[in-house]
Amino acid sequence: MPADPDLLERSSVLKGDLLEYARSAPLARELKAELRRQFSGFALADEGEMIEFFDSFILEHRLRDGRTVLERYLDDHPKLAEEDRAVLRGWRDPIQGLFEVLERTGDTLVVLNLVDALSYRVRTNAGPQAVRQMRPKSFLAARIVPLDDEWLLSGDQQIYPHSARAEVLKAAAQIAFSLPHLAFRNPETLRRGWELQERDRGWFIEFFGSDTVILERDEAARRLDEFGRFQIERAMAAAGKKPKKNARPPVPSDTGWVDELTEGATIGLVYDAADGMGIYADFQTFLDAFTGPGPKATPAQIKVVRSYLTEDSISPAIFRRMADQHPDATDRVFQQLLRKPGFTWSADGEALLRKHKKEQADAVPLPRLVPLGEDLATHFTPPGR
């Protein structure tokens, strides 16, 4: 159902109010800091760049208190009309994508998001002239926000001709790979992602004999490379394909990071059903903190546990796994680490994870494997290739 024309006009007023709020004195320091970060060392930004900057700053940038400008605006305006509040609440979940224009009628587009493979009916509050150059079969880099049962163009848009199709598909494939949550907006892609991860975990267990394996530093790169080739063989077999005669072997994964580990360090590979495969340095020392025979972990073990807790790249899943498998030991380890005798994981564990890993701890679990459609898969270049 098309959005009410009054709602379309009201959305323009609300965007103006948000822009004025973003430029207000309480946000001046953070606005200046973000402007310097975005444009320091560059020539003066053009109009399109500034439009895009402010749209992203309002809808996506996290302020020091963890809120977006939009969320702070909603909190600071409790008397805002409920109709307006409903519109703005929808804008908390913008979609950034690469779109193919399928249809154009007046100020309305029907577009296909190449990243999530979903179609959207999109309006503009700037009049038909704003979409005049967005012809069918052209491509659009844009941000859209919900507006009733439709979507609204937000910020600046970049238009690409049909002749740029290969480059646009390549960019869309890279976005889906590096920002998988955008691809998983599609329920079918999400379902397929979980299926692929379950299958891949089965291959991991078949290859290593368990969902958890500890490797010595010197053998880690070789074993990871062997597993990568094993995955490819299994995937080809599952697809009913046979390796071509005299075919070149797959390019090995980049395992150069192994050389950066200290001598004697162990590497843990843990393939969690929900969290996917995690790679952990000094994993034997970490594991010994929870499984060792003594009543207390050693200082070296506590040091590694603390590093896991404070390191952003370490998933909360490994701590939840320890708590499930070794509940009493987990309580003891964190009582010792935090110097809090009353700490229990059941009562305090999730709060601890949110303190140190809030974004990951609160995130909805998503598959680590992203199934790409035929067009994107054809144009995808894996990292390091």
Give the predicted meaning of each segment.
Residues 262-385:
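Extended, amphipathic alpha-helical scaffolds
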Residues 107-111:
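Short aromatic-glycine-enriched beta-strand elements
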Residues 139-141, 146-319:
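Mixed-charge (acidic/basic) macromolecular-recognition segments
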Residues 1-82:
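A structured, charge-rich N-terminal accessory region that forms the first stable segment of a protein
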Residues 125-143:
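Short nucleic-acid-contacting surface segments enriched for D/E, G, S/T with interspersed K/R
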Residues 89-106:
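Structural detector for short beta-strands of small beta-barrel domains
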Residues 118-126:
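A short macromolecule-binding patch
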